[in-house]
Amino acid sequence: MTTLASSISERYIGLMSGTSLDGVDGVLVDFSGPRPMLLTDAYVPFPPALRQAFFDLQSAGHNEIHREALAANALADLYAECVAQLLHESGCDPREVRAIGAHGQTIRHQPGEHDGIGYTRQTQHAAVLAERTGIDVIADFRSRDIAAGGQGAPLVPAVHRALFALPDAWRVVCNIGGIANLTVLPPQQSDARDRVLGFDCGPGNALLDYWVHAHRGEAYDRNGEWARSGWIDAALLETLRSEPFFARMPPKSTGRDLFNPTWLQQQAGDTLERIRPEDVQATLLALTADTIADAVRTHAPRTASLVVCGGGARNGALMQRLAAQLPGTLVAASDDFGVPAHQVEALAFAWLARQCVRREPGNVYHATGAAGPRVLGTIYPA
């Protein structure tokens, strides 16, 4: 068993299960050097029943407190399995790991722009994870930022800056999970170097995954091939892009609370029945790519490159559409810059755990809109 007080290790584990509801990404990271060193990574897929349980918990339903507790327990089992894989593959003893940063599964995100302090819920059973692994667990990273008047998101800009910022050029990092978010990184040798901007810009894979599952029974559209087989419906795309969220200025955040099947049905109406399903898929892909590109043009018009991470980086059709929408900007997956696309967010939560252990702020407060820098996370000692 290891404790925050007794350990001097700079090794941390980060665990992330995002709004795509596909599974758990885990990384073991060593922070003892000038840059984070990824020692190993692991992935544990969600069983279909758990994926459905989390999807159902994103809207009101019967006996949801009980159902959330069961889902949180099941997630703790998957997190513990992911930790076991990381330790086994690296040969690392649990006592050598300072702490685990566990994000949990977002089921509600209401930062409260209109009625005071809001809330966010990343369900998990961190106490069970600490018990199973014998390692201190840091969880609930977003609540403190919201308590300070922020959006609770995005929490990854500081890590994006450490990994991807350029000395003499603007760069944008885009994480495309269920929701897409941007980090705008100024040149680090300029007077603007501290003006890091981060915000959610709209749907990522969430609507694409929903539509392909509803019509083909597949968890996701591999490489965007089904979307490639369809035609973009210009009228539907224009209707979807009329959503007021897209025009709002940062700081802003969103989730499946907004961009969900109900929203799609309300926006599109009977168009979903009149055109081919693959045409809807093509249009949803264009919605994701075009709203990301709009945000880049608006908030980082001088950017030299767009670094894409998350599951969307593996969607060739989506990456192609992004590049077409941003001529003159290099669009590439984070793998091309030395960090595998699926590891970036998990690495961020390892870093946030380290910040909490060191009692140092984890939020970029001018990106989230919080009143100031805050130490994020709740500690569950082993």
From Swiss-Prot:
GO terms for biological process: 1,6-anhydro-N-acetyl-beta-muramic acid catabolic process; amino sugar metabolic process; peptidoglycan turnover. Pathway: Amino-sugar metabolism; 1,6-anhydro-N-acetylmuramate degradation; Cell wall biogenesis; peptidoglycan recycling. Keywords: ATP-binding, Carbohydrate metabolism, Kinase, Nucleotide-binding, Transferase. Pfam families: AnmK. One of its GO terms (molecular function) is ATP binding. The keyword Repeat does not apply. InterPro entries: Anhydro_N_Ac-Mur_kinase, ATPase_NBD. It catalyses: 1,6-anhydro-N-acetyl-beta-muramate + ATP + H2O = N-acetyl-D-muramate 6-phosphate + ADP + H(+). ATP binds at residues 18-25. Catalyzes the specific phosphorylation of 1,6-anhydro-N-acetylmuramic acid (anhMurNAc) with the simultaneous cleavage of the 1,6-anhydro ring, generating MurNAc-6-P. Is required for the utilization of anhMurNAc either imported from the medium or derived from its own cell wall murein, and thus plays a role in cell wall recycling. PANTHER family: ANHYDRO-N-ACETYLMURAMIC ACID KINASE. Belongs to the anhydro-N-acetylmuramic acid kinase family. This is Anhydro-N-acetylmuramic acid kinase. It comes from Ralstonia nicotianae (strain ATCC BAA-1114 / GMI1000) (Ralstonia solanacearum). The lineage of its organism: Bacteria, Pseudomonadati, Pseudomonadota, Betaproteobacteria, Burkholderiales.
